């Protein structure tokens, strides 16, 4: 049965740890990181059109239509598949831009998977992930939809099964420039690689944290406040800060104390993304 319209979630991710092993000749950094999803994110609605036009109806401040990763993902998939159909796209955006929780990458992956379904292309996960990698290093993990240990620039993925606590995520009102952090001379770039799987507990360090905390007082403040209740971590290069709790009630309790002065949300960690659970339910 063909569908005309489809609404899919576009979940956030956390980097439970992030180690920087060195800088490559192409300027990118060799990383090791552990990705986990949150049952929290944007919602994207797709509606088929038969004239081949790709149109995103939701405007993003400061982002031209054709520069949006959602539009880029749709156009690349259309070009490479030879599909003659078009798509109308709307997004209910709640994930912050530049927060380190994968908003743009997740949107691109949801677009690839949603259009593969609506356009009935029959592309497998490997092919979609390879296309996703041309859009951004974090897109493949969202395409594959499973918590993973990532290496290289983040594209070599091994499934992992970390605990799935409740998280309180704080969102400092500042956008961190990833390029700025990775070019900081004080950034640690020589962490020894982790060679055992699963990733041993206790490897929860983010090598970007000292640099981000030094440059951005808003992030430093969030880390200090959350750190009074649980281990406070940085996801990606920030700006979002998070901590795990054994129950929703405990996360909610701390959230009530901290969100008087800080923006934040409580969400369940998940090793299978809510996007993939939704797609499975459509089969």
From Swiss-Prot:
Keyword Kinase: yes
Metabolic or biological pathway: Isoprenoid biosynthesis; isopentenyl diphosphate biosynthesis via DXP pathway; isopentenyl diphosphate from 1-deoxy-D-xylulose 5-phosphate: step 3/6
Active site: 13, 138
Residue positions binding ATP: 96-106
Record-linked Pfam families: GHMP_kinases_C, GHMP_kinases_N
One biological process term in Gene Ontology: terpenoid biosynthetic process
PANTHER family in UniProt: 4-DIPHOSPHOCYTIDYL-2-C-METHYL-D-ERYTHRITOL KINASE, CHLOROPLASTIC
Name under which the protein is recorded: 4-diphosphocytidyl-2-C-methyl-D-erythritol kinase
Native organism: Pseudomonas fluorescens (strain ATCC BAA-477 / NRRL B-23932 / Pf-5)
């Amino acid at each position: 049965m063909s569908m005309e319209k489809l609404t899919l979630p576009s979940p956030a991710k956390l980097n439970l740890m992030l180690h920087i092993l060195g800088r490559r000749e192409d300027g990118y950094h060799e990383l090791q990181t552990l990705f986990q999803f949150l049952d929290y994110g944007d919602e994207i609605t797709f509606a088929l059109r038969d004239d081949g036009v790709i149109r995103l109806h939701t405007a993003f401040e400061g982002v031209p239509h054709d520069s949006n990763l959602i539009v880029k993902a749709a156009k690349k998939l259309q070009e490479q598949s030879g599909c003659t159909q078009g798509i109308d796209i709307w997004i209910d955006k709640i994930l912050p831009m530049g927060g380190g929780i994968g908003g743009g990458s997740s949107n691109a992956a949801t677009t690839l998977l949603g259009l593969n379904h609506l356009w009935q292309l029959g592309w497998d996960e490997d092919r979609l992930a390879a296309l996703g990698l041309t859009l951004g290093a974090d897109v493949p993990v969202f395409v594959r939809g499973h918590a993973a240990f990532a290496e290289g620039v983040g594209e070599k993925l091994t499934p992992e099964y970390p605990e799935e606590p409740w998280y309180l995520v704080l969102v400092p009102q500042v956008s961190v420039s990833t390029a700025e952090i990775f070019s900081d001379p004080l950034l640690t770039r020589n962490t020894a690689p982790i060679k055992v799987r699963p990733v041993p507990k206790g490897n929860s360090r983010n090598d970007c944290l000292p640099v981000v905390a030094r440059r951005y007082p808003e992030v430093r403040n969030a880390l200090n406040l959350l750190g009074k209740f649980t281990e406070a971590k940085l996801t990606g290069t920030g700006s979002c800060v998070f901590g795990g709790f054994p129950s929703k009630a405990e996360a909610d309790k701390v959230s009530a104390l901290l969100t008087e002065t800080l923006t934040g949300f409580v969400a369940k960690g998940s090793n299978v993304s809510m996007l993939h659970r939704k797609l499975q339910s459509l089969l």
